[in-house]
Amino acid sequence: MTADEVRARINAKRQELVDLIATIDAAGLSAPGPDGSWAIKDHLVHIGAWEHWLLALFEGRNELLAMGTSGEVNEVDDINNEVWQRHRDDSIDEARRYFEDAHRDLMAVLAEKTTEDFDRPYPSSFDNAAGLTFLTPVAANTYEHYDEHIGWIKEMRAKPAQR
């Protein structure tokens, strides 16, 4: 996949997510999920946090600290929980701003990347990442991630939390 194709795929799937979010009112964005956990606004923060992780990867910074975690956990569920704990009381506006700012900053960096950049191996602290190229975390933390959360958000809307 060329760099332009990567960016086009990111932009298309991101727009699908943004369009979905635009159909949800404030009450829907802040209501807990069917299991009583993450609200839709928490999904936005989560996506933004992983975009911060990806941005830090390209900038050579500590990815976990860039997400706002303690940097002391390395299991994905623990990382996600730390991010949620830190941001769960954020307002809808704060969650949106975090989501939008992370994406803007990431896309500014990705705009400069070439196909060769995406094809280079990347260093990772995750055990299962040996030998993967930069395209793998780019896909996993952008268009594949958006698609995953689009599905969950649609499920949440179909089956809201019991009040």
Where are these predicted regions, by residue range?
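Short, solvent-exposed segments of well-ordered alpha helices
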Residues: 1-4, 34, 38-41, 93, ...
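Short, helix-capping/interhelical loops that line the mouth of catalytic, cofactor-
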Residues: 1-5, 53-99, 158-163
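Alpha-helical transition-metal enzyme core signature, strongest for iron centers
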Residues: 10-17, 40-55, 84-86, 92, ...
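Acidic interhelical loop/turn segments
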Residues: 21-37, 104-138
